[in-house]
């Protein structure tokens, strides 16, 4: 079971482990040659890095169902809709200061929906924070400490592409809210995609990571941030030696978007669908091992089509960096950055060739024309939009999806009570094909004796009748 690392609590403690380290940055990797080398301490590295790792406290107001819901006595007065209770929910995670002006990087799930965010430094100082940029698809958030101080301790960001399996690492965070804690381990694997994330490409480590470590630092032996601790695989919620970190090179791209003042994190639009290469496909195509991203569909006029990609081909590398799976392709394109031109190595009929692609954000070729549907109809309270590659990308839908999509719903609105959900695609209303938000708005006027609605959800058509 995957566990995102977030926990409530307080306090402070410190841990250290062993391994060789000079006070100077080491440029060469080496294997310990004696037991004496194994008895040296990580303490100099901890002193160098731990000050930039902070605790992140987030508070949010949440709606809880009344404990009297379903009680016949209280339903005499309130009916079936019992009033909800508003409660304050607190959570605790970690973060890393990456700029001296107080810029902090953490996980989106640590601060998502928070009404109030504070950070605490290892020296005990606390500061309020503002959210500069956040994105649930890559699970990253940039915070800015509200302070006149422009000289906060900083953890420099390293090159995660230089990380190798077997490298020594430190994990620094605030597990279970006990206070700043340091653990050590090695890089167990690279390019992991078992974590639910839009850009499925993670560093795996056996350094002990527990709930509360979310947003904490994974550092190399030269004191650089190489990953942001994000998730663990665990049956009981504690560490079992399988932890995952978002690579630092993705953190760099996300920080650059925040520094530019971007309000959203735009990833490159490919205009194609991909699937993993199976052993059967690898054998049929003459691949020496199971790797790459199999092209299954290409959108006419999209970047992939312009680059010459065709269904049935396999992308095996980008800028000569091997592509292990479709998630790795998405990661490499994202870290290359918008505006970059990349070289794709493509396998077609057993032969490899190169194609170039210039990266751009998904276009809004059809104006989204958002509308809040109101009135006496099943969609009352739903905000809908015309689909385009950009809207589809924002909602994690296939790029070639057309029509009208439900973006969000007002709480307790007729649309929500009837079971509609964000990402539902409205296909027809009373036999009228819904091709735009204007058509939908016109279709829900009037007072028919019943409503016949067809939607598409997760690729399945659903037909419903309402009176």
Cite the ranges covered by each PLM segment.
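Glycine-biased strand-turn-strand hairpin within the trypsin-fold
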Residues: 26-43, 48-101, 112-114, 125, ...
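Active-site loop architecture of trypsin-fold serine endopeptidases
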Residues: 29, 35, 42, 63-66, ...
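Cytochrome P450 catalytic-core helices
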Residues: 102, 106, 223
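Short glycine/Trp-rich loop-beta-loop segment that forms part of the substrate-binding cleft
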Residues: 103, 125, 158-179, 258
């Amino acid at each position: 079971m995957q566990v995102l690392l977030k926990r409530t609590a307080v306090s402070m403690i410190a841990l250290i482990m062993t391994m060789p380290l000079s006070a100077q940055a080491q440029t060469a990797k080496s294997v310990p040659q004696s037991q004496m080398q194994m008895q040296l301490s990580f303490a100099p590295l901890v002193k160098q890095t731990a000050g930039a790792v902070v605790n992140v406290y987030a508070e949010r107001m949440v709606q809880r169902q009344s404990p009297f819901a379903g009680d016949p006595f209280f339903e005499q007065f309130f009916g079936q809709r019992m009033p909800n209770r508003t409660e304050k929910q607190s959570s605790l995670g970690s973060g890393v200061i990456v700029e001296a002006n107080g810029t902090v990087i953490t996980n989106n799930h640590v601060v998502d929906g928070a009404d109030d965010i504070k950070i605490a430094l290892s020296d005990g100082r606390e500061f309020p924070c503002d959210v500069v940029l956040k994105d649930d698809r890559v699970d990253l958030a940039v915070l800015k400490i509200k302070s006149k101080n422009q000289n906060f301790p900083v953890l420099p960001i390293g090159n995660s592409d230089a990380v190798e399996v077997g490298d020594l690492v430190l994990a620094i965070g605030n597990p279970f809210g006990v206070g700043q804690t340091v653990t050590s381990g090695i890089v167990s694997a690279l390019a992991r995609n078992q974590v639910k994330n839009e850009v499925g490409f993670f560093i795996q480590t056996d350094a002990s990571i527990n709930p509360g470590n979310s947003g904490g630092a994974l550092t190399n032996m030269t004191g650089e941030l190489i990953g942001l601790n994000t998730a663990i695989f665990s049956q009981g919620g504690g560490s079992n030696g399988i932890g995952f970190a978002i690579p630092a090179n993705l953190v760099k791209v996300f920080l650059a978007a925040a520094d530019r003042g971007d309000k959203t994190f735009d990833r490159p639009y490919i205009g194609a669908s991909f699937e993993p290469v199976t052993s059967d496909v690898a054998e049929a195509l003459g691949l020496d091992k199971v790797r790459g991203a199999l092209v299954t569909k290409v959108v006419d006029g999209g970047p992939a089509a312009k680059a010459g990609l065709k269904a049935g081909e396999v992308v095996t590398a980008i800028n000569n960096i091997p592509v292990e799976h479709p998630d790795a392709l998405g990661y490499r394109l994202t870290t290359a950055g918008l505006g970059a031109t990349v070289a794709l190595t493509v396998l077609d009929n057993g032969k490899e060739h190169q194609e170039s692609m210039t990266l751009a954000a998904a276009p809004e070729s059809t104006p989204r024309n958002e509308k809040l549907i109101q009135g006496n109809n099943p969609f009352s309270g739903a905000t809908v939009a015309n689909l385009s590659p950009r809207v589809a990308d924002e909602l994690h839908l296939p790029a070639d999806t057309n029509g009208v999509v439900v973006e969000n719903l007002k709480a307790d609105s007729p649309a929500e009570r009837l079971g509609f959900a964000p990402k539902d695609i409205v296909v027809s209303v009373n036999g009228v094909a819904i091709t735009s938000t204007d058509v939908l708005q016109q279709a829900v006027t009037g007072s028919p004796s019943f409503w016949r609605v067809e939607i598409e959800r997760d690729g399945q058509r659903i037909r419903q009748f309402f009176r």
